[in-house]
Design a protein with these regions (language model features):
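PLD/PLD-like phosphodiesterase catalytic module centered on the HKD motif
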Residues: 1-169
Length: 169
């Protein structure tokens, strides 16, 4: 059954995300967000590092349009590669509209949890803004999860007319 996350009234998305990553249920974490700032990454970094050190995989896509992503926040995410299997793709395309998704996917071999909402990886997006998200549990083979995976893949693929680059520290 889908769950509606209403921040800050009932949930803080940052706490929810930290709890999910620390639960040791998931082997892969993917996210695509419009903006990331150190104000957000400082809350997530210890748990993201532990997730990687426990054998998890992280694949991130971050937009840099409209100057809302900070260098420091991006640098934090890029540094994750030193702790395990982590990639960060930077999305920037001067010829198109702003990259603006907020899509999170936690998965393992038998289960997937998709979260679609308005939360960026900023302190305000994770904790203080009025934000909403819809959480859907399904299998990795379900149509909605396959469609989400296809979206992640297309945003990482420069052959689809999208300017992306994978960075590492």
């Amino acid at each position: 059954m889908p769950v509606f996350l209403n921040q800050p009234i009932a949930h803080r998305f940052g706490k929810y995300l930290l709890d999910e990553l620390a639960a040791e249920r998931w082997s892969r974490f993917q996210a695509a967000v419009a903006w990331v700032r150190r104000s957000g990454t400082r809350h997530l970094m210890p748990t993201l590092r532990a997730f990687l050190q426990g054998g998890g995989e992280i694949r991130l896509i971050v937009g840099v349009d409209i100057a809302h992503t900070s260098f420091e926040g991006l640098e934090d995410l890029l540094s994750l590669a030193t702790y395990g299997s982590a990639t960060t793709h930077v999305f920037h395309n001067e010829d198109s509209a702003v990259f603006h998704p907020k899509l999170y996917l936690l998965s393992n071999a038998t289960a997937a949890r998709l979260v679609v909402g308005s939360n960026n990886i900023t302190e305000s997006g994770l904790y203080t803004n009025t934000e909403v998200a819809l959480m859907i549990d399904d299998t990795p083979q379900s149509k909605v999860v396959i469609d989400a995976e296809a979206s992640f893949d297309s945003w990482r693929d420069p052959l689809h007319g999208i300017s992306t680059q994978e960075f590492s520290c």
